[in-house]
Design a protein with these regions (language model features):
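Cytosolic, long alpha-helical scaffolding segments
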Residues: 1-235
Length: 235
């Protein structure tokens, strides 16, 4: 078999893996969106659907990881290709954790519904929806950057990460005020604080994806690096 033929096969295998990563990304993005919908509408059926699909997310991580190991064992990837394979491994781990956060939100919804909180108290769930919209947009942008290995778009994700953190801080203050003003809301407000934290972590995982993309293209590890320094790397 010629070297060119082997190279073409390898490129096809890399393309197939990247396609599976994007498929997994689309699934976890949908999981987060549905979990938040379940929360804002106190919809037990949607929450249950999210939990039913959690196993599929975990299965995809295992399958893609297995394929990665197989490629590394059979091929001799160049430095950049090896960086891509490493980045894919990190990416699917982050996506699996996003799926975990979606499941955590869904379980919280079921608990709130089962305790009757949704009918007894007026909770600030709409504020959580805005934070979630930001996090989902970040995740979508990071996946788009992954599909194109677009460092400029990855940099945008890093720049916008603080906005989600600020939303979380604002929600935390609001929920603390809720608890102080009405002790009946303490238990449910604590649940919503954990939901807000789960949403913030979705943004953190999107940031991790963006950093992995820059690592693939530029060969520089930009974790724990200021946005200003990352800009210099991307230029």
């Amino acid at each position: 078999m010629t070297e060119k033929h082997l190279s073409t096969q390898f490129e096809a295998e890399l393309g197939a893996i990247s396609g599976r990563v994007l498929e997994m990304g689309g699934l976890v993005e949908s999981q987060v969106a549905q979990a938040v919908y379940a929360l804002t509408n106190f919809n037990d059926e949607t929450a249950a659907h999210v939990l039913q699909r959690e196993g599929r997310v975990n299965q995809m991580e295992v399958e893609i990881d297995r394929d990665l190991s197989d490629i590394i064992a059979r091929r001799q990837p160049t430095a950049r290709d090896l960086r891509l394979l490493i980045a894919v491994s990190k990416t699917i781990a982050n996506l699996e954790r996003v799926g975990d956060e979606a499941a955590r939100i869904a379980r919280t919804v079921q608990r709130l519904i089962n305790t009757g909180v949704s009918t007894r108290l007026r909770l600030p769930v709409a504020d959580l929806s805005f934070e979630a919209d930001l996090a989902i947009a970040q995740l979508r942008k990071a996946l788009d950057a992954f599909a194109r290995l677009d460092t400029a778009k990855a940099l945008e994700v890093l720049k916008q990460d603080d906005q989600i953190d600020q939303e979380f801080d604002g929600l935390l203050r609001k929920l603390i005020t809720y608890m102080m003003e009405d002790p009946r809301t303490i238990s449910s407000s604590i649940d919503l604080i954990f939901v807000a934290k789960a949403i913030e972590r979705v943004g953190d995982h999107a940031k991790n994806l963006a950093e992995a993309i820059i690592y693939v293209v530029k060969g520089t590890d930009v974790r724990h690096t200021s946005v200003e320094d990352v800009e210099n790397v991307v230029r």
